[in-house]
Amino acid sequence: MKLRRQGWSRRDVLQLAPATLLGTALNQAACTDKDQATTNSAENRINRVRRFTVTSKRWKVVGKNSHLDVHGDTATDALLIIDTTGGQQGFGWSRSNEGDAAELLDRDPLDFFQPGRGIVSPLGRGDAPLWDLTGKILNEPAWRLLGGYGPEWVPVYDGSIYFSDLQPEYADRGIPRIFEEIDHSLELGHRAFKIKVGRGFKWMAPEPGLVRDIEVVRAIRAHVGPDVKLMVDSNNGYDLATTKRFLKEADIEFFFVEEMFPESVEEDLELKGWIRSRDWNTLVADGESASEPEHFTPYIDRVAFDVLQGDMRRFGFTELRDLARTAAPSGIGLAPHNWGSYLGLYMQLILGRGIPNFVMAEQDPAHTELFDASDFELREGRMRVPDTPGCGLALRTERLADETLDWELHV
């Protein structure tokens, strides 16, 4: 079946009984590890919390999508660093405020870890720093604490193929400029690309915009050949009828189609049925704009999409792991939305090795020397997720002076 060749299928999710038993065993082991760590470090307390705004640099200027103007060449992350009296340090993305962070002070970090449930803390969804810290204290990778269901090598895609052909500085190159960006990413190891469409929503007249969208995706397919995965995302710049016309005239079996129109259960179901009627294996992906997990309930109940795309940073590890559990019996996978973040990629990768129904991680091509990511490796469209305790990244603390300190709390 083509979906299996591409790396993930609904059938994979329906064969999870052994993984569920494994997850139970891992949770029991985590309980034992937690009890032992608590015994050995009864006096370990959180004594310092800092939040920084971290700026990372893209190798290119990312252009427009259907709704927004040029996205630029930088991305920003909210970095929370937690230190303990025992000398451990956990860090990760979190927009938690000073009031919430103050409730961590003088607490045992392991008080917030509940095996089988996750991190329950004043940080709420901004739980990545505590997952990192808990893993380091227990000497376990965070992905194992999340369940350990996923593969060592997690599929990843380049999500940065925007409307470069419409940028004035590339006017003399047009579509070949997009080829340059793709070729660069292919050299880095990517084998999957998400292409923005919807030029006719705002930046061109509707008909010429649609024609250009079709021209671009056809040209990219011809350029990269049949073995590279392609996805499209209109950022709700189409309606259902335009989506069908685009897919029919492009005549490409995309791996998934994302946010093709403002999401609704009925229209997502109609698109799924129309795709199946053409004997395509293309998956329907949606949900990046959701702000609460309850948003997904009717979509999961009726299996209105194939891929759930709750935002990685908005929901965090614990809630996305819970959503994955809810979605798995319906054969729905997770490919969290991630844009405008360096740290978001590595959060997805940890989640991807932790849950059984993870589809692909989205990379924003941002980079910063603040973090050492050398334990991760990109090869042939997949990234190796290491066994390093915590979330796998190392912090170059000497470079923190180059970032903006938002606030600091200490005992």
Residue ranges of each PLM-predicted region?
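C-terminal segment of N-terminal export signals and the immediately downstream linker at the start
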Residues: 27-64
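Metal- or metallocofactor-binding catalytic centers and their adjacent structured scaffolds
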Residues: 48-53, 82-149
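N-terminal export leaders
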Residues: 8-26
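Catalytic core of soluble alpha/beta enzymes
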Residues: 204, 210-339, 344
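N-terminal secretory signal peptides
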Residues: 1-8
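Flexible C-terminal active-site loop/helix
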Residues: 18, 44-56, 323, 340-411
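Conserved, mostly hydrophobic/aromatic
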Residues: 87, 139, 257, 299, ...
